[in-house]
Amino acid sequence: MAGTEVTDSYGRRTVFQGSLLISDTTDTDDERKPQWLDIDIWRTNGGSYVVQKAVRYRVAHAIATCGRLGGYEIRDATEADTFRCPGCNPNGDRHSSWGQESRIAVDVYSSPEQLIESLKVDGKLTRLSRALLADLSEQDGRIDELWNTVVVD
């Protein structure tokens, strides 16, 4: 089956046919954030939603076992890793050899209700979630119906 293939941090592949509804980032044009989120949302030809969230980093670590890594994968540091880790190299006087790999999650939701619920943090929609839903509602009638219509008893 030809189509779109996305892979999470564990190597699990999700393959589907559909269209990209939104691709957004919390990064800035001047790349001044040490950590940011990239999010892509597709609607499959069958009507499900595929969400890929990638937490990305520009932090250089001096110690491969730095506690701020939280057990996540590391890689060789690159020129893009412009922020020194405040935990293992706060003064910048140690050579920073390691960068943190992106953490990528891929989830599939069978309904717009499930998708909207998945965008909540601690049971509430964040500013980012609301902006995503506003953009998504312009492209998907099912999301528009749920998101832009509030029914009050």
Which residue stretches match the model-derived regions?
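Short, charged/polar N-terminal "headpieces" of proteins
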Residues: 1-30
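Amphipathic alpha-helical interaction modules
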Residues: 44-52, 69-72
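Short, mixed charged/polar active-site loops
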Residues: 13-15, 36, 101
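Low-complexity intrinsically disordered segments
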Residues: 76-84, 89-153
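Exposed acidic/polar residues on beta-strands and adjacent loops within beta-sheet cores, strongest
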Residues: 31-35, 57-58, 145, 150-153
